[in-house]
Amino acid sequence: MHKQNKTCKIQQCVLKYIHTILGVVIMQGAIFDVDGTILDSMTAWVDITNEFFTEHGINISKEETLSYQSMSFEESLIGIHNAYLPNMAIPEMFDEFSRRASEKYSKNLPAKPYVCEYIRTLYNDGVKIAAATSGFPELVYSAFKRLKIYDMFSVYAFSGEVGCSKSSPDIYLLAAKRLGLKPEDCTVYEDIVTGIKSAKSAGFKTVAVEDATNTQDKDRLIQYSDRYITGWDELLSNI
């Protein structure tokens, strides 16, 4: 096994040298959003949010429900608390949302088709991989372990650590720092416009991922990203 790993590293070094001579840019780091990018979960979160509002007697439009997806979870809870439930403690809201989501993430929430294969291919090619997400750490970890991709991620970065939403590139910069890489050496994979724009502004290459909840933003995702994909098989076919 040790000999195989050594041989693989030598092959990777030779390949990188050849690419450098030819002027080919090699991706050293891949930074993935989780919900809506790796996990087919955005519709589930819309359902969870709608169920929460219904049980508390709150009427809310689809557009407003979707607006929360660009926020960190902490920002979403504060917004809901201030606008609709000032008498409900935020920790209580946190526990309720977490309880609703926990079973889905740990048992049956699916990954998007071919994304695990793509991540595995990058991992085998020696690319450093990070997750940058607004989600709960426990939910992300449980889903990734179930999907057998947890150990392929070198680092994890959460919006709660940087204290702001993805309209700021801080979470992507944190992920790159933990990978030991510069932004220009990393590609960010995202499904929301604010994330694509902020990552691009910080010097990252960007790939926008189509999702059932972002079709209204397709034109802007195409405009601001380096590439737009409708499915992960598109990237697998290029490897």
State the predicted function of each range.
Residues 38, 111, 129-132, 164, ...:
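Conserved SAM-binding loop
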Residues 68-72, 110-114, 135, 167, ...:
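Short beta->alpha linker loops
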